[in-house]
Amino acid sequence: MRSGLRVLLGLTATVTLGAGIVVPAFTASASASSTYAAETWHWGPTASTDYKGWATGKIRSTSSGLRVSGDLYDAGGARTCSWVKIKWLTDHGRYRTATFKNCSQSTPRAFSVNTGYMLSAEAKVCRGTSTRITGRCSGWEGVWSQGG
């Protein structure tokens, strides 16, 4: 019979049972403390000016910097595509960009780019053909910046 459950906070958590047996309590937080804990920031949705393309995503910390990832949706007509352009400022003061397209109205396209250590990131969603952006772009939306 259990007389009480006592959780001790500290480096090791133990559960004391009424019979006097001490059993270590393994929790997700205890095992996660030994591995790398990633931080995540969410952004979006960001839509094109005609609202037929939009993107949403997250920024996750990795051991080699940050990774911008998300999904690009297309709700346009025939022979049109949605594009997302990610622009980030590196810790060396240079701007880098990555562009992804989705021409499928039935499924979102997942995208991901490793940005390394950066100071800020912005995203915009545009409409276009299967080969290039033709216009109807949203403004640059700030999706992440160092220090908030």
List each language-model region with its residue ranges:
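Post-signal peptide N-terminal regions of Sec-secreted extracellular proteins
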Residues: 31-148
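N-terminal prepro-regions of secreted/extracellular proteins
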Residues: 1-52
